[in-house]
């Protein structure tokens, strides 16, 4: 590594450590920011000599990255951005902090995938899903798929592990059609993780025709784009690998969606040569992920934290939550996106019949949505008020990003 890069890496580690010591955060952003100011090519230098996996998508990135890092860890030390800092500053900080490791598994914000592909030259890229998220400032889903596709076409040597159930992901992972409009066979390993949210993939990104669905299958009514046959699938409480062998998966994380994330992790690890029978044992070591799914006992209540930041992830959170009193917390600060109209894309009907409490900066926006959805609720001013308002036992907490962080801080829980 050049001298400038060595100095930048050292300063990055020092800045991150000082940030942690001063209680100003985990240092996962500031360290990388300073390092890249000293050497703009620092991420590329730190990536050299490592076998790297990138994990990107709208939802499930952090959990899948943690599961994948655990699975790849069978082979040796793995650098990873476990705090969820998923932009180049976070990647730089994570690699600088880890030092020399043979492997790295990095969560990548979907908007930065092309840039990080160029800098890191990964061995494999995992594409999870694409759906609407922070539309007041983020790109439309179809535009995001176009960016992914353009980036991947420039890196034909990179292995791709992609979700066969998401038409946008399949199109992005598939090479452009040839001159006679047939879609070229993709050089991709496909997994099936399901797709609960369909509202962003009814129109074919290739020709503009309608996407048709029947059971697990989907296809375009106007061109050859259709669901590919997945090599990795979820079956009951396990995962079926490309040989047809079934592996029981014992996770400490709730919800069927995390079984799909586990299938993705096993597929990515297999690209590094990890046998599923070895990798599956490591998946059960993952508990909470950057506070997600954490359970905290407070005043006789067992409080479980679930993060939901867009319509698709709210539906998944409802699936994970027990039939118990539930607190919903909504903010609209810069990291959340300022537009809360997406609340009307979420069907809150699954919450009927349980005690529902609401709080957060934009609790009244949420109140209007629940009123329209005929879901009774109680407004509380603080998280502490919510805890006192429910009987002893389980309290499910579903919150968007900054609301989630506020509640974590109140619980003094920093992972």
Question: Over which residues does each language-model region extend?
Answer:
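ATP-dependent carboxylate-amine ligase
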Residues: 1-32, 48, 208, 220-227, ...
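Phosphate-binding loop of NTP-binding sites
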Residues: 3-190, 202
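Adenine nucleotide phosphate-binding catalytic loops in nucleotide-utilizing enzymes
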Residues: 4, 186, 190-311
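A generic structural signal for short, well-ordered alpha-helical segments in conserved domains
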Residues: 65-69, 266, 367, 408
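Buried hydrophobic packing segments
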Residues: 68, 72, 91-95, 262-272, ...
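Short, acidic/turn-prone active-site loops that include or flank metal/cofactor-
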Residues: 83-86, 129-133, 193-196, 331-334, ...
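Short, surface-exposed amphipathic charged segments that create phosphate/polyanion-binding patches used
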Residues: 95, 141-142, 200-211, 389-396
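Residue-level signal for inorganic ion chemistry
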Residues: 107, 128, 161, 261, ...
């Amino acid at each position: 590594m050049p001298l400038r890069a060595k100095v930048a890496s050292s300063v990055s580690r020092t800045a991150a450590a000082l940030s942690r010591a001063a209680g100003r955060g985990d240092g996962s952003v500031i360290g990388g920011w300073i390092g890249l100011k000293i050497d703009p090519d620092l991420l590329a230098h730190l990536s050299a000599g490592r076998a790297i996996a990138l994990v990107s998508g709208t939802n499930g990135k952090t959990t899948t990255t943690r599961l994948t890092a655990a699975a790849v860890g069978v082979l040796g030390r793995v650098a990873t951005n476990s705090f969820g800092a998923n932009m180049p500053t976070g990647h730089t900080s994570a690699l600088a902090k880890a030092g020399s490791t043979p492997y790295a598994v990095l969560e990548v914000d979907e908007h930065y995938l092309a840039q990080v592909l160029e800098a890191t030259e990964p061995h494999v890229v995992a594409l999870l899903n694409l759906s609407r998220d922070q539309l007041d400032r983020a790109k439309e889903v179809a535009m995001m798929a176009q960016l992914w596709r353009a980036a991947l076409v420039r890196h034909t040597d990179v292995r791709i592990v992609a979700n066969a159930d998401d038409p946008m992901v399949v199109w992005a992972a598939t090479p452009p059609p040839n001159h006679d409009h047939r879609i070229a066979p993709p050089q991709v390993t496909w997994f099936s993780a399901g797709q609960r949210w369909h509202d962003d993939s009814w129109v074919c990104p290739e020709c503009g025709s309608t996407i048709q669905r029947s059971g697990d299958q989907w296809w375009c009514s106007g061109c050859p784009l259709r669901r590919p046959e997945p090599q990795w699938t979820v079956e009951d409480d396990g995962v079926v690998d490309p040989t047809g062998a079934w592996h029981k998966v014992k996770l400490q994380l709730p919800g069927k969606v995390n079984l799909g994330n586990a299938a993705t992790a096993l597929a990515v690890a297999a690209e590094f040569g990890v046998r599923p029978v070895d990798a599956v044992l490591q998946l059960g070591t993952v508990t909470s992920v950057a506070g997600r799914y954490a359970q905290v006992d407070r005043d006789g209540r067992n409080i479980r934290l679930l993060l939901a930041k867009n319509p698709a992830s709210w539906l998944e959170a409802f699936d994970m939550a027990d039939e118990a009193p539930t607190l919903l917390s909504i903010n609209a600060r810069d990291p959340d996106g300022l537009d809360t109209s997406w609340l009307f894309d979420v069907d809150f009907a699954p919450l009927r019949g349980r005690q529902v409490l609401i709080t957060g900066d934009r609790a009244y926006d949420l109140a209007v949505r629940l009123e329209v959805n005929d879901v009774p609720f109680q407004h509380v001013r603080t998280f502490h008020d919510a805890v006192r308002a429910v009987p002893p036992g389980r309290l499910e907490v579903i919150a968007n990003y900054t609301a989630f962080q506020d509640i974590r801080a109140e619980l003094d829980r920093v992972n």
